[in-house]
Amino acid sequence: MATKQGTPKVFHKMHVKTGDTVQVIAGKDKGKIGEIVQALPQLSKVIVKGVNIKTKHVKPQQEGESGRIVTQEFPIHSSNVMLYSTKQNVASRVCYTFTSEGKKVRKLKKTGEILDK
């Protein structure tokens, strides 16, 4: 992402983090469930395991080496995923609440399940 010289990079606040289980709610992989492998806050995108798999043809880098075909997960926008409760098997929106110790945690609206420990 090209930015003008002297301007800071913009990091978008995302409702999901690396390691969260999510369900895809839009796109060609709608309905698939997977774990977030990597979050990209600069682009507001996430890489979900087993979702948005594309085939990439790689040229040989050295002489004598043969080219190969690689399949890998590509990023999807964070707005196209919804947090998923593995205990209740339901996708839910997220809200923020405070624990009795005063720590801010994420909570699933449908189930009341606390995500952050």
Swiss-Prot record:
Keywords: Ribonucleoprotein, Ribosomal protein, RNA-binding, rRNA-binding
Family annotation (Pfam families): KOW, ribosomal_L24
GO BP terms, alphabetized: translation
GO molecular function: rRNA binding; structural constituent of ribosome
GO cellular component terms listed in the entry, alphabetical order: ribonucleoprotein complex; ribosome
Listed InterPro entries: KOW, Rib_uL2_dom2, Ribosomal_uL24, Ribosomal_uL24_CS, Ribosomal_uL24_KOW, Translation_prot_SH3-like_sf
Cystine pairings recorded for this chain: none
SMART domains in alphabetical order: KOW
Record has Iron-sulfur as a keyword: no
The keyword Glycosyltransferase belongs to this UniProt entry's keyword annotation: no
Family: Belongs to the universal ribosomal protein uL24 family.
Role this protein plays: One of two assembly initiator proteins, it binds directly to the 5'-end of the 23S rRNA, where it nucleates assembly of the 50S subunit. One of the proteins that surrounds the polypeptide exit tunnel on the outside of the subunit.
Subunit structure: Part of the 50S ribosomal subunit.
NCBIfam families: rplX_bact
Name of this chain's protein: Large ribosomal subunit protein uL24
